Amino acid sequence: MKKVLLVDDSATILMMQKMALKTTPYQVITANNGEDGVKKAIAEKPDLILMDVIMPKMTGFEACRRLRQEEATKTIPIIMVTTRGEPINVEEGFQSGCTDYVTKPIDTFELLNKLRDQLGE
C-alpha cells in the first residue's frame, strides 16, 4: 500500500484531504507543520507528500528544501497545495524542489488525478 503524507497547519484542510483520499488505497499520514512533516517524511518514507506553504515552525518551501537534501526523501514527489498562486510563489515552490504546485481550493477530482499522475498510476 502506498503512503501519502499530508502536511498542513489547518486541521480542517487535513480533514478535507483525508476525506478526499478515503476511497483510495493509500495509507494517509498527517503532520501539522513543516518541521513535523520533515521528521515524518524521513521516518515514514511516504510515496508522495502534499505540502502546504504557509505553516508555523517551518514553511513548506523550507521543508521541501530540507527533504531534497536528505538521501531517504530526495526523490519523493512533493505537491505544494496552497492559497499562494502568484507566479513568484509558484517559482519559489519549484526552486525549493516540489514536483507540482496547485492552488486552494482544489477540486477533489483534480487532487486525485495529481496524486495518480505523480505516483505513476
Cite the ranges covered by each PLM segment.
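Charged docking surfaces used in two-component/phosphorelay signaling
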Residues: M15-T23, N113
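Active-site beta3 strand of CheY-like receiver
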Residues: E44-L50
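C-terminal output helix
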Residues: I106-L115
